[in-house]
């Protein structure tokens, strides 16, 4: 019987990050997947990034994860969203060559030391009882083999009792054309895990040769600047990638009428589908009935790769019958002759309510069993990858008897994601938004490396060279800011008012520092560099764009950032008030039973976490603080 330190079940985005983290930290690791051909597959949209999701991807990269580097090697378009808004919500988004992304991820797994990649459907978890505790001991696969493990990470995506719906037709599948896992959920229930149902969906894929692009709005990529998800990607490699345009189309009243007439044939509305779907990624029929006054909805045409004609039609996710899908498509401008290559469908699947896991992503029921990705009730590749990385890290540290890594919501979007899941739970597939973070002006995608690379380095996931690069950037930002603060300029420097007038700013009559000039909304760091060329002894050349952009953001938004840092300081004081593991909530007579039950189940490790649990009031928190003070904590 083969034996591993850690076994990962599932080869999706969570599973890949978990397996790589475990193996790179020195553990003998195996990743099991139903099919080796679908490792790292993008089940729905062939893209990474977008608001808050790019923040997660950048944080994964800063901690030493793989997702950012993988998309940089395989993107076919990249651009920045929300450029007219503030830096907190600006986000990078890349369109992937779907097949290349999966192949590159598989190659990375296969070339990683300490990692075995095995095809096999896991049918059962081997759990034993020791000293009254359930402890994971390994797995069994349908092929009849058993494997021992000290820890197991479950990252099964939509495959647990997956049920696909297309109109009146439904059938078992984990993804279209792939087997669902029917035995593993039974094993999870047998060992005491609670399972519930969620639903998601995916749109039609169209033959790109049958679309009339001349009547659509083009969305080109951005080749004017270096754009990349990973700081370890070379600038020249990112710039050299060939980019393909995306396009925008729209539905119309005729399409909406077709959908309204087919309402009773939609499993979403006729009672066939029981699981709740993602509110922020609704099907087209959901949008039509939820927003009856809207006479059109955007559709996004995104190529699935260099070597395919398949076009992903974002915004047209559906569970309607195929004849209705055909009819509504032909009534969209530009799609009169369009041919469908893959039909849209909805899928229901099992998930474990996230209140069942600890902040480390370990199960509360079975020791050394970790859960990551959609099984925890989330939606999205980046959300899955973030959980996979943290599950891998914490599984390793648990086996080494080391302190767990629990990221604070004030330090990262990953921390916000996990804290939201465990403290609040979710009644729909959870998707990350910048609005979910109260510290979003500090938690920007551009400073993810400054926030988290040191931790990734200490964990052994970030190489020395990358760590030193980030530390140099930190030092350079400070040096440049100090130079700007102490360098005075006046109207005698002809370039000062030249730039100010060109940017629509008021010219100066008296002296100013370069720092004060940079605070002006329309003045960029490039402008400051231009002005500084006329100042003897000042050299602002030779710094990379990443560093100078960081200077510009911190200078322009200094007041807001300082306000956010004060909020974080206040938040940290709550997070630093630890709750003893042996606390007996029954001793707190003033706390209602409902709140006590939640506190007992979730077991918050500090006052901050306790305060965010749904159903726990400020009065309950005050009672806990008084109790801890009386105990001398």
Swiss-Prot record:
GO terms for molecular function: flavin adenine dinucleotide binding. One of its GO terms (biological process) is tRNA methylation. It is found in: Cytoplasm. Coiled coil: none annotated. Belongs to the MnmG family. NAD-binding protein involved in the addition of a carboxymethylaminomethyl (cmnm) group at the wobble position (U34) of certain tRNAs, forming tRNA-cmnm(5)s(2)U34. This is tRNA uridine 5-carboxymethylaminomethyl modification enzyme MnmG 2. It comes from Fusobacterium nucleatum subsp. nucleatum (strain ATCC 25586 / DSM 15643 / BCRC 10681 / CIP 101130 / JCM 8532 / KCTC 2640 / LMG 13131 / VPI 4355).
């Amino acid at each position: 019987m083969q034996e591993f330190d850690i076994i990962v079940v599932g080869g999706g985005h969570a599973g890949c990050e978990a397996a790589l983290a475990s193996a790179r930290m020195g553990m003998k690791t195996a990743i099991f997947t139903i099919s080796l051909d679908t490792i790292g597959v993008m089940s729905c949209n062939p893209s990474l990034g977008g608001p808050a999701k790019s923040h997660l991807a950048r944080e994964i990269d800063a901690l030493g994860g793989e997702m950012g580097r993988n998309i940089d090697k395989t993107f076919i378009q990249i651009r920045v969203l929300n450029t007219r808004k503030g830096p907190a919500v600006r986000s990078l988004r890349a369109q992937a060559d779907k097949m290349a992304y999966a192949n590159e991820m598989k190659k990375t797994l296969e070339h990683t030391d300490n990692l075995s990649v095995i095809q096999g459907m896991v049918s059962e978890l081997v759990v034993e009882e020791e000293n009254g505790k359930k402890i994971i001991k390994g797995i069994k696969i349908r092929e009849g083999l058993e494997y021992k493990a000290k820890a197991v990470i479950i990252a099964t995506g939509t495959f647990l009792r997956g049920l696909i719906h297309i109109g009146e037709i439904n059938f078992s599948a984990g993804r279209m054309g792939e087997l669902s896992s029917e035995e593993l959920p039974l094993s999870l229930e047998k060992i005491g895990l609670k399972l519930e149902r969620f639903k998601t969906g995916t749109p039609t894929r169209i033959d790109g040769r049958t679309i009339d692009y001349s009547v659509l709005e083009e969305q080109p990529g951005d080749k004017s600047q270096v754009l990349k998800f990973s700081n370890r990607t070379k600038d020249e490699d990112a710039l050299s990638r060939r980019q393909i345009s995306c396009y925008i189309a729209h539905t119309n009243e005729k399409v909406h009428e077709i959908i309204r007439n087919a309402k009773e044939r939609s499993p979403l509305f006729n009672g066939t589908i029981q699981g709740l779907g993602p509110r922020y990624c609704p099907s087209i029929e959901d949008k039509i009935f939820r927003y009856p006054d809207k006479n059109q909805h955007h559709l996004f045409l995104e190529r699935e790769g260099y070597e395919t004609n398949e076009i992903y039609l974002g915004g047209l996710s559906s569970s309607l019958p195929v004849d209705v899908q055909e009819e509504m498509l032909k009534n969209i401008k530009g799609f009169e002759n369009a041919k469908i290559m893959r039909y849209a469908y909805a899928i229901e699947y099992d998930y474990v309510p996230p209140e069942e896991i600890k902040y480390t992503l370990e199960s509360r029921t079975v020791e050394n069993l970790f859960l990551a990705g959609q099984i925890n009730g989330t939606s999205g590749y980046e959300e899955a990858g973030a959980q996979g990385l943290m599950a891998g890290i914490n599984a390793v540290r648990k086996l080494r008897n080391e302190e767990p890594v629990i990221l604070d919501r004030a330090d990262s979007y990953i921390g916000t994601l996990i804290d939201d899941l465990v403290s609040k739970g979710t009644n729909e597939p959870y998707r990350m938004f910048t609005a979910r973070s109260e510290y979003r002006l500090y938690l920007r995608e551009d400073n993810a490396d400054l926030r988290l690379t040191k931790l990734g380095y200490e964990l052994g996931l970030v190489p020395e060279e990358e760590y030193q690069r980030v530390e140099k950037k930190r030092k350079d930002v400070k040096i440049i800011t100090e130079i700007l603060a102490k360098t005075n300029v006046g109207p005698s420097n002809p370039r000062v008012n030249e730039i100010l007038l060109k940017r629509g700013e008021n010219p100066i009559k008296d002296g100013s520092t370069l720092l004060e000039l940079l605070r002006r909304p329309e003045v960029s760091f490039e402008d400051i560099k231009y002005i500084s060329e006329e100042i003897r002894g000042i050299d602002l050349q030779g710094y990379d764009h990443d560093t100078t952009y960081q200077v510009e953001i911190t200078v322009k938004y200094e007041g807001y950032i300082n306000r956010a840092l004060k909020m974080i300081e206040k938040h940290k004081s709550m997070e630093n008030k630890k709750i003893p593991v042996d606390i007996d909530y029954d001793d707190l007579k003033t706390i209602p039973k409902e709140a006590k039950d939640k506190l007992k189940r979730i077991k918050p490790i500090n006052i901050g976490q306790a305060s965010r649990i749904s159903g726990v009031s400020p009065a309950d928190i005050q009672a806990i603080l008084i109790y801890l003070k009386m105990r001398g904590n």
